[in-house]
Amino acid sequence: MLNIGCHLSSSKGFKNMGENALKIGANTFQFFTRNPRGSKAKDIDENDVKEFLELAKENKFCKILAHAPYTLNACSADERNREFAIEIMADDLKRMEYIPNNLYNFHPGSHVKQGTEVGIEYISSALNSILKKDQTTKVLLETMSGKGTEVGRNFEEIAEIIKRVELKEHVGVCLDTCHIHDAGYDIVNELDEVLEEFDSMIGLDKLYAIHLNDSKNPFESHKDRHETIGNGYIGLDALTNIINHPKLCHLPFFLETPNELEGYKREIELLKSAYKK
């Protein structure tokens, strides 16, 4: 079975997201934990959560993926911004325990000319501050395109962050196809080699989710602009190879393409028809 979903609005709660996922043929979904700008999160509706968990179990959902606000920067040059990122992520992880054993994804951040080493140290320190031994949520570092001073533009940087985390069992990676293509990893022509490099640097056992996106920009452009499936520089054939790859096919895939629900439904149908497992 292809485990696939897309990014959904959380404005009407978990059950509504689950119902919308089912309407488009998905068995998982991604959502923002709060407004993308990082404002106060809505109170948890425990009855809504209970109904969602029942729906998810009944329909055999795989793990869902929470996404931290884009504006968080755990390696900012401004100490207040770093503290804010830690505060929000810690609160998010506390709230995630209402839906245990799922995934939480965040962008590592930008070092803003402090240097990559400083950025890596701040990010790993932030993770060491927020991770708890008894948490059930896996925290995922997202691979980035290398725009500006982003940290996480290559596998080495992700690996170094994880190396410095004390509770390594609670961290992993979310691989974004658009990002790594734009960062210079040739997933179109050399997918096996890219996965071998990931495995040697980080370990495929640390890969827990994939953002499945096409790219509006050419290879190694460091731009990060997502395109609908099959209409970008990555292309349908390469994305089909990814969902069918024996080292990846068991993972949950999350679409973040520029789409509404009907567009996501068409993409999910297209990818399901191309899935061979």
From Swiss-Prot:
Binding site for Zn(2+) 2: E142, D176, H211, E256
Annotated cofactor note: Binds 3 Zn(2+) ions.
Co-factor(s): Zn(2+)
Binding site for Zn(2+) 1: H67, H107, E142
Alphabetized UniProt keyword annotations: DNA damage, DNA repair, Endonuclease, Hydrolase, Metal-binding, Nuclease, Zinc
Pfam families assigned: AP_endonuc_2
UniProt: Zn(2+) 3 binding residues: H179, D224, H226
Family: Belongs to the AP endonuclease 2 family.
Designated name of the protein: Probable endonuclease 4
UniProt source species: Clostridium botulinum (strain Alaska E43 / Type E3)
